[in-house]
Amino acid sequence: MEFPGSSDNYLTITGPGHPFLTGTETFHTPSLGDEEFEIPPISLDSDPSLAVSDVVGHFDDLGDPSGVQDEGFATQYGVQTLDMPVEMTHEVMDQTGGLLGAGLAMDLDHPIVTPYSANPPVTIDVSMTDMSSGILGHSQLTTIDQSELSSQLGLSLGGGAILHPVQSPEDHLSPTPSPTSSLHDEDMEDFRRITAPKNIIVEQAKKPKTPKKKKKKDPNEPQKPLSAYALFFRDTQAAIKGQNPNATFGEVSKIVASMWDSLGEEQKQVYKRKTEAAKKEYLKALALYKANQLSQVAVDTVDLDPPAVPALLSESPVPSPSVVTATSIPECVSSPSAPSPPSQTVALPQQSIAKIIISKQILPAGQNPTSIALSQGVVTVIPATVVTSRGLPLAQLQPSPQAQRVTRSVLQAAMQMPPRLQPPPLQQMQQPPRLQQMAPAQQPSITILQSPPPLQPMQKVRLTLQQPPPLQIKIIPPPLQPQPQAVQVQNQSLSVINVSTSPEAPASPPEQLEVLPEVVQEESPPPQMDVELVSSSPPPSLSPQPRCVRSGCENAPIECKDWDNEYCSNECVVKHCRDTFMAWIAARSQGTLATVK
């Protein structure tokens, strides 16, 4: 007999006239690998007189409690059986006791095809022995269908195909299921239950790619300036539309292009100059916008958590800490005639005050800001321009818990600066003699009032010590270009500086530097430290007043979105467009006459 699907595998049956092999005869199939399989007899046709006990009798050590029931199945349905002893080891058992993992694997080099696809399914009785933690008991038989054995238990047939039966064994055995088949169903159910979560995990691992979101344009970003031709087009299209109301945009564009070509070089230069001026303004506005964005990020990352304010000075008293207030003050040189203590100017490398701001994420881990401040004896205060120029209203910076938290966070961020970073050029003033009478343990409240407007090179500084505790330094600056400077007051015992800017002080011409120390000897330490940060916005810089675009008009333009605030009235708009259009017609008519001549 030849197996379908192959050309070199034959099954030789000895003994003429016998419908099946006896129990003592075996056969050997070549080219099946290194293993030898002892295969029990195979019945070639369905014989009602054949009992399962005759076939299973070859294995004396096996006992099937359901043998009588299987005999009934064989008699009624003519089930073809294949008994095969398979030794199971602990390696084929999963940790849960099911037939998983390496499983029952039979690697056959050649394809095997069931020759009776139309007959009832082939049933393999596999003896499960040497199983300590399995579901089946010792020496107990189970009925496994060939298709489920290959799909569920990993029966690898060396690349060959298996023709599955037309009907499943459940269809044949459903009327009277045997104990072994029900046990097999439980095995399959456990296998599916265990393998189901693995499939879910694989599906969850594949996440769809999120589409990239387009960055929204900031409405505060300055708009790019128009070109010279765009300005000309904007000025002339209204006049063309007035004369030809039904003209389409394409026709208007052609007319404007022709007018631009025939326009004189001087008139073109007018528009080009406008474009250049608009470009310069755009670049300035763009630079300010980008700087504002970067500094806004730095201010947003400052920690606004409210730690205890008195801990800055009360944690470990230091004999002589000094408070360095970094303000936007140009470098000052005290005049010899000014009634001030001996002073000297120390030149240090220029550094940006904004660099003192350190975001919360990059602070050194486990570093206490108060310990740094007290060990070095220096507390650096960020200028008010850094905070108020970022959109913080003055109402929030009044003496309130919010203002204290903002200023305190700025102080803590400033204290993280390494000692080698020094502020810009300092104006050091010697301590007045009466300041030494203050006790080291006293902690007056700090009031920080700074003015961000630019200052004149010469300014008036008034140092006053008032009662109750606070010390105040009043800086009255007239507005001009800023140059960073810090005022440092050295104190042997304890010196707390309150920098207050009098907002009501008007801008004044350059004045001498005056330091007027007024100290109250008896001061009691306050219960807590009040920190306030108040700042005013700088006045806008003066610029030449714009004029109306129409030639000959000296009036100032009015605010109008349609004409970009370039005309003083609608009459000027019409006159300007009419003059431009008439100039174009005149230039065109001259060109036509020249061509006719």
Curated annotation (Swiss-Prot):
Pfam families: HMG_box
SUPFAM superfamilies referenced in this protein's UniProt entry, alphabetically: HMG-box
Record motif Nuclear localization signal, residues: 212-217
Superkingdom of the source species: Eukaryota
DNA-binding region ranges: 222-290
One GO CC term on file: nucleus
Subcellular location(s) per record: Nucleus; Chromosome
Renumbered residue ranges of the record's region Disordered: 160-224, 520-546
GO terms assigned for molecular function: DNA binding
Chief localization: nucleus
Keywords associated with the record: Chromosome, DNA-binding, Nucleus, Phosphoprotein
Compositionally biased region (Basic residues): 207-217
A Gene Ontology BP annotation from the UniProt entry: positive regulation of transcription elongation by RNA polymerase II
Subunit structure: Component of the PNUTS-PP1 phosphatase complex.
Function: Transcription factor that modulates cell fate reprogramming from the somatic state to the pluripotent and neuronal fate. Also acts as a regulatory component of protein phosphatase 1 (PP1) complexes. Component of the PNUTS-PP1 protein phosphatase complex, a PP1 complex that regulates RNA polymerase II transcription pause-release. PNUTS-PP1 also plays a role in the control of chromatin structure and cell cycle progression during the transition from mitosis into interphase.
Protein name as catalogued: TOX high mobility group box family member 4
Species for this entry: Xenopus tropicalis (Western clawed frog)
